[in-house]
Amino acid sequence: PKPTLARVNGSAYGGGVGLVACCDIAIGVEGAKFSLSEAKLGLVPAVISPYVVAAIDARQARKLFQTAEVFEAPEAARIGLLHRCVPAAELDEAVDRELHWLGKGGPLAQAEAKSLALRMGGMTRADAERIDTENARLIARLRVSPEGQEGLAAFLDKRAPRWVNP
């Protein structure tokens, strides 16, 4: 595996948060906004959930998965989604600094270090594949549910969803 770096110069919602969470290093500008917005659509962030939970911890994830609230870059840094939050004028310099340090490491050592950290996180490749399969089933089931259909229709119609209690 190669090192990955997220350079966040804007907002990230839904799967965009997942992409940030997947990266080894994440740097964002102070004005960036984030939201795990799937619940507003009657869905869940199933596909990205393993990566988001690994980045921000389960308790933060429970809150943000359910509320779908918008949070800003300083909060993203505080909870671990971003490693650094910088003024927009300093983003390129901050990214260059990280790339400088990455460029000093041996590629094999970096790949093994990344693999080691992933293993220490407790998830094997088989675990990840099983979770991906379970999450794919979950999101497929929710997308065709009445709630998922209403959420997506409301999003496309640019209106508030009309939720019905189960």
Regions found by a protein language model. Give the residues of each.
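Crotonase-fold acyl-CoA enzyme core
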Residues: 1-110, 145, 159
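Helix-loop "lid/cap" segments that line or gate small-molecule binding pockets
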Residues: 64-65, 116-122, 137-143
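Short beta-strand->loop
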Residues: 124-131
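Short C-terminal tail/terminal secondary-structure segment
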Residues: 160-166
